[in-house]
Amino acid sequence: MMYYPDVPALEPDELELLCHEYLEYNATLDPHLADQMGVKRGLRNLDGTGVLAGITNVSNVIGYDKKEDGTIVPIPGRLVYRGIDIDTLAAEADAHDRFMFEEVIWLLLFGSLPTQEQYAKFRKLLEHHRELPQGFADDMILNSPSPNLMNKMARSVLAMYSYDEHAEDNSLPNILRQSINLIAELPTMMVNAYQIKRRVYDRSSMYFHLPTEGQSTAEHILSTYRADQKFTHEEARLLDLCLLVHADHGGGNCSTFTCRVLSSSGTDTYAAISSAIGALKGPKHGGANLKVMHQLDYILENVEDPSNDDEVREFLRKILRKERGDGSGLIYGMGHAVYTMSDPRAQILKTHAKSLAYKKGYDEEYELLCSIERLAPQVFAEEKHGPKKVCANVDLFSGLIYRMLGISEDLYTPLFAIARVPGWCAHRVEEVEFANRIIRPAYKYLGKPQEYVPLEKR
């Protein structure tokens, strides 16, 4: 359903003419030329590793060792938040059966573990700021719905500028204030945007629940998302774990680097964070877990016996050869730019998803994902004949967890944004406080000289 009236549009023949004009004069950007000129396409080295573009204290992504001759040595993956492995954080949450995301927010923002008193006050602070400013929900969400929640969240964050008397103040106290507010408000923005999207575009009922006192971020999301506001402790803990493992991933990933680039220009917090949401919206960055679920359903529909390794292996081979699936040749949920032997996030989610999968009748889906994790590296090695190692990434199991929690596919990527905003804010603070230099890489110009011809002679 189109909510807004149609606007005047270019006719198809006009668009075709414009496309022809563009392609005629812009067909010279051959990727091989970039390689020959030593250009680091995608800010990647030839071995696939990222170009070193900055330094950070926020987090570290470890997936390989490098020998003196440049050879990459695969190792088990690690993700470290402010010097602490996420495995340690997840184990702590398990040992005491408690929510950990709020502690991770503090850790990423400030670099330390909060004391008990600081932790209690910080949770109260986040609770206090979950409600949106007076009139914001009506003006920015209810009266201007969007079929895409990431689009709506980016616009909502940008609009918060108008509700902040000190929006342009880039001092440390003010950026921290803005960061805490956005971290608290974004889940409410997401759920509200989803409800109005249901009403306008899906023609379904919408329902709005006020935040409940004493809830963690994960509990707040489930409570405001579900019509009956009911959820189990196990469900909330599993969602909290998803938020924990997605909270940050180094300074070089697309959305975080986008946030750093904008922050380096001296722009405001709302512009920087909305741009990060826009980057995460891209299917090459934040939408992979949805593609995993679509591919999982496709395999279940087309493989006679999903428990048979030989059948699954050969079907994965056909996907890799672009003979089946969406034609991309990608096995979604497998492979990563940094991790080689394992992605610690995937291992944490895999371990914790099993119990709920068997309780809720998703054991077939869970076991098939485990088979894909086990068989895909072998198929990849046989088909590609290269040295690159592939392993399951965080997307392989996160989509199944959201499905088991009854969460709409509309919210898969927005939940990623909810989890990642503390990391974005931590990197923004670091960029503004310490970098002090605008990020400005170079591009090699390949255009040909041409004479200017006066308009009357053309």
Which residues are covered by each model-predicted region?
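Non-transmembrane, aqueous-exposed alpha-helical and coiled segments at domain scale
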Residues: 2-458
